[in-house]
Design a protein with these regions (language model features):
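Short loop/helix-cap segments at secondary-structure boundaries that form the rim of catalytic
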Residues: 58-61, 109-112, 163-166, 184-185
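A short acidic, often aromatic-flanked loop/helix-cap motif at beta-alpha or helix-coil junctions
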Residues: 50-55, 126-128, 140, 179-181
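Conserved beta-strand termini and adjacent loop/short-helix elements that scaffold enzyme active sites
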Residues: 46-49, 121, 157, 174
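Short, flexible loop segments at the rims of nucleotide/cofactor-binding pockets, characterized by
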Residues: 43-48, 77-80, 130-134, 149-151, ...
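N-terminal beta1-alpha1 cap of cysteine-dependent amidohydrolase-like domains
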Residues: 1-88, 92-96, 223-224
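Cysteine-nucleophile active-site neighborhood
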Residues: 72-139
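Amide-donor transfer/coupling interface in amidating biosynthetic enzymes
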Residues: 2-19, 24-36, 89, 135-224
């Protein structure tokens, strides 16, 4: 049975607020999505910002066939201890795990560790849905977009974007908000597929997230 590691990007306090609000955490959504396709996987979960056993997990990273790193409300350019722990953990993962799917925040962490850069979005933000993502010619040849419509919409929630890709990256998809909506690159021993959207989150959950974050969004002038 193949072994998969899911990395939770949100802080424990944020996840508790999700639970208190009746909303599934990103890890729970990822598990639901995986279970929809197969239950024939052994799945472990780690939160590098909050868990006390991260060093033990690092020692055994090479036992995993793949890793999925999910979303977060954090901003990579804020130099906090929690973010530094995530960057350190991603660095270990890139040295030990061959296949990584990096979703939204996960992509931003993977890109940063591999030498790229993330900044605040300059052309707006995705607040629930990313419209008109277009797969380019390289993307149409990539397995992540096999049988995918060339132009599609999908759940997304991000205010930051990748502005500089790691060396030897292949841009796969873009839209009018973010040039980097899909990317493939290698770092360490890892083949990394990165996406700036959330295929694991239902539209229903995204609506709940918007209601849940209404005050925060308004205070941050997210709809200005």
């Amino acid at each position: 049975m193949k072994k998969i590691l899911i990395v939770e990007g949100n802080l424990r306090e944020e996840n508790q607020s999700f639970t208190d609000g009746g909303i599934k955490t990103h890890t729970e959504s990822l598990k639901d999505s995986i279970n929809y396709f197969t239950k024939d996987l052994e799945i472990d979960v780690v939160n590098p910002s909050s868990d006390s056993n991260v060093s033990d997990v690092v020692k055994n990273l090479n036992k995993y066939d793949g890793m999925i790193w999910g979303g977060s409300s954090l901003n990579i350019y804020n130099d906090t201890p929690e973010i530094r722990r995530q960057l350190d953990f991603m660095r270990e993962c890139q040295n030990n795990i061959k296949n990584i799917l990096a979703i939204c925040w996960g992509m931003q962490v993977a890109v940063t560790v591999a030498g790229g850069e993330v900044k605040r979005c300059e052309r707006g933000a995705h607040r629930g849905i990313a419209h008109d993502i277009e797969i380019n010619e390289e993307g149409l040849k990539h397995n992540i977009y096999k049988n995918k419509n060339k132009i599609f919409n999908t759940p997304a929630f991000n205010f930051d974007e990748v502005v500089t890709l790691p060396a030897n990256s292949i841009l796969l998809a873009s839209n009018s908000i973010n040039k980097v909506m899909g990317v493939s690159f290698k770092a360490g021993v890892s083949n990394i597929w990165g996406i700036q959207y959330h295929p694991e989150i239902s539209y229903e959950k995204m609506i709940s997230l918007i209601h849940f974050r209404t005050e925060r969004l308004l205070n941050n002038k997210a709809f200005k």
